[in-house]
């Protein structure tokens, strides 16, 4: 069938947005609502992926579990946050989706909202109790992702919710190291004004200033000095 993503028909219907047929089949056999496919995904996972809000709402009204994970550890909330499905994220949170759930990579939904630049979703997750400093298996936080990707507004959002600027990942890099390495000039400047240290060394014994390219290092040094002088 068209939109065939799964070896389970009900999952394909959820992904394709075929609400009436999905309803008909599930009302005839309730067990289909929680049937898992070859990836341990349910109809809810697939509806979240494709952004079919009405199907998600129907499944949630039936009381399907909201926190079941697929074989890569992704919950429906991970999928909806990564795909930018604002209304679905809201519905899942109302039903008690675990906001700090981690997948096989140690990532929370907030990690994906930060790297994909999903502002509204990040705010919903943080308002719902997401840990702004949650670390993945590489000890990277949402701030590392936002800084590396050049998502300035996301950096602002994370700082508003008290995210740390100086956490080091497994390579010893802070968000400022990554911003400098990726030449994210505005993000790097803003991080320095918000307390990001220019002195922390990574595993290569380099500070953010030593990682910075062009004239960025000098700009950040002057910025940090003026911040220190005003304290």
UniProtKB/Swiss-Prot annotation:
The keyword Repeat applies. SUPFAM superfamilies: Ankyrin repeat (SSF48403). Keywords: ANK repeat, Apoptosis, Chaperone, Cytoplasm, Nucleus, Repeat. It is found in: Cytoplasm; Nucleus. InterPro entries: Ank_repeat_dom-contain_49, Ankyrin_rpt, Ankyrin_rpt-contain_sf. Pfam families: Ank, Ank_2. GO terms for biological process: apoptotic process; negative regulation of apoptotic process; negative regulation of DNA damage response, signal transduction by p53 class mediator; negative regulation of MAPK cascade; negative regulation of NF-kappaB transcription factor activity; negative regulation of release of cytochrome c from mitochondria; negative regulation of transcription by RNA polymerase II; positive regulation of cell growth. ANK repeats lie at residues 3-36, 37-69, 70-102, 103-135, 136-168, 169-201, 202-226. Gene3D superfamilies: Ankyrin repeat-containing domain (1.25.40.20). One of its GO terms (cellular component) is microtubule cytoskeleton. Part of transient complex containing PSMD10, PSMC4, PSMC5 and PAAF1 formed during the assembly of the 26S proteasome. Stays associated throughout the assembly of the PA700/19S RC and is released upon association with the 20S core. Interacts with PSMC4. Interacts with RB1. Interacts with CDK4. Interacts with MDM2. Interacts with RELA. Associates with a CDK4:CCND2 serine/threonine kinase complex. Interacts with ARHGDIA and increases the interaction between ARHGDIA and RHOA, hence promotes ARHGDIA inactivation of RHOA and ROCK. Acts as a chaperone during the assembly of the 26S proteasome, specifically of the PA700/19S regulatory complex (RC). In the initial step of the base subcomplex assembly is part of an intermediate PSMD10:PSMC4:PSMC5:PAAF1 module which probably assembles with a PSMD5:PSMC2:PSMC1:PSMD2 module. Independently of the proteasome, regulates EGF-induced AKT activation through inhibition of the RHOA/ROCK/PTEN pathway, leading to prolonged AKT activation. Plays an important role in RAS-induced tumorigenesis. This is 26S proteasome non-ATPase regulatory subunit 10. It comes from Mus musculus. The gene is Psmd10.
């Amino acid at each position: 069938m068209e939109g065939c993503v799964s070896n389970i028909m009900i999952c394909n219907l959820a992904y394709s947005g075929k609400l009436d047929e999905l309803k008909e089949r599930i009302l005839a056999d309730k067990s289909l609502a929680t049937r898992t496919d070859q990836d341990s995904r349910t109809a809810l996972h697939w509806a979240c992926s494709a952004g079919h809000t009405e199907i998600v709402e129907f499944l949630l009204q039936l009381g399907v579990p909201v926190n079941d994970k697929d074989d890569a550890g992704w919950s429906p909330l991970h999928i909806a946050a990564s795909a930018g499905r604002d209304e679905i994220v809201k519905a899942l949170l109302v039903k008690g989706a675990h906001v700090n759930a981690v997948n096989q990579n140690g990532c929370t939904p907030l990690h994906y909202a930060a790297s994909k630049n999903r502002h509204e979703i990040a705010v919903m997750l943080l308002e719902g109790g997401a840990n702004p400093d949650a670390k993945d298996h590489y000890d990277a936080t949402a701030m590392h992702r936002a800084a590396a990707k050049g998502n300035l507004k996301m950096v602002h959002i994370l700082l508003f919710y008290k995210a740390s600027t100086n956490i080091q990942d497994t390579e010893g890099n802070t968000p400022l190291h990554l911003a400098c390495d990726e030449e994210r000039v505005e993000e790097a400047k803003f991080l320095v004004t918000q307390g990001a240290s220019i002195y922390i060394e990574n595993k290569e014994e380099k500070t953010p200033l030593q990682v910075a390219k062009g004239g960025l290092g000098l700009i950040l040094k002057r910025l940090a000095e003026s911040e220190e002088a005003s304290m």
